[in-house]
């Protein structure tokens, strides 16, 4: 670690952000701004599991004759939260619409992980202001991760007074009450809980499709990487009980779903909060191997918690797919230390070795940040060399974006933007080079494809994904949508494969 990095790290841990005048009177008394000091205070209170969600009689037909619209930003967790909110709206009697002009309620389900995502939300709120003028009865709401940031709520209260309601990630189940309050209140209704929520089971859902489904296995994150806002916006780690997860997946399988993605901010930490049983992600995956469903995958994993038992179970195959998304963020041990990732370059490479030994055909993908405070040219080159050594199939790459309230935001962001862009360009060139090399190896191979639907670029072509998450385009009857088929790969591109159908749907044993 060089001297600049050591000083920056010390400053991040010691400096305190000045409190600004805000609108905290609008918050419930339990709300606290997202600061490292407060957010690290993980309470020892037992997480309650509520299994009796239901709508009181006062909400029956509450939304009859009304329509709702939800715009979702961010990760799969947000997408799944939107499915839950759509389920609650539908239970209230609302109908969905794809037009804000037709909607009686517009919700923006937001993402806080990068500044660009927040800018998009405030831009959309600006567009909705004109719609509110034309339709004063329209209810506009902001929910999701941005709502957990007090500075964001302050900005909404100051500059976006046409917003009727703001609520966070921990109280989605209270949507009916929030809607009712917003409908009859002259002021913006703000219901944001800093205290992490309980685990609410049996919430209604309107799933996006009938082929693949997302299933939450846990909520929150306790890792506190210095650049990441998620531990503040999603709260402490809380795991669902295994019996509830297995029951939900069995129900989805019985209803014809072919693929399940297990969701969590850090799925590898699943079960670490259980006090009555020793049960982790490896144990859950071992039980899910016995469920009659074609594919099980998970996201997102943290290298720190990726244990040998999980690797052993994944090596058994079956319905457990060979694709693993394993964010590394940097190839430099010094940068990883400043990021508080709690593993080294050597640890990561050893983990990759174990995975490839247990699962010889494993496909690995990753996330990488460039331009983190004080990142040197040499440290960036370590990231490039690690990428080559692992041989990732692809990566999500990002320029570092400071998030207010995180330790990294207190570090001096002293890597010039032109340097950040140049590094990102070089990294992306490497990502693209390896991606086409990896895809070229599929030429002539026959792969199993789960058919999602029509190609976005050509309705005469079908598109689907392999077990290793490769997009495959091919011509076939639309009756095969939702089926598992065999496709011979005839051509490879950087981000997709082309092929020919070689046989009828596969029977899943």
Curated annotation (Swiss-Prot):
It is found in: Cytoplasm. Transmembrane segments: none annotated. [4Fe-4S] cluster 1 binds at residues 75, 111, 145. Residues 1-13 have a biased composition (Polar residues). One of its GO terms (molecular function) is metal ion binding. Residues 66-184 form the MTTase N-terminal domain. Residues 1-26 are annotated as: Disordered. PROSITE patterns: MTTASE_N, MTTASE_RADICAL, RADICAL_SAM, TRAM. This is tRNA-2-methylthio-N(6)-dimethylallyladenosine synthase. It comes from Bacillus cereus (strain ATCC 10987 / NRS 248). The lineage of its organism: Bacteria, Bacillati, Bacillota, Bacilli, Bacillales.
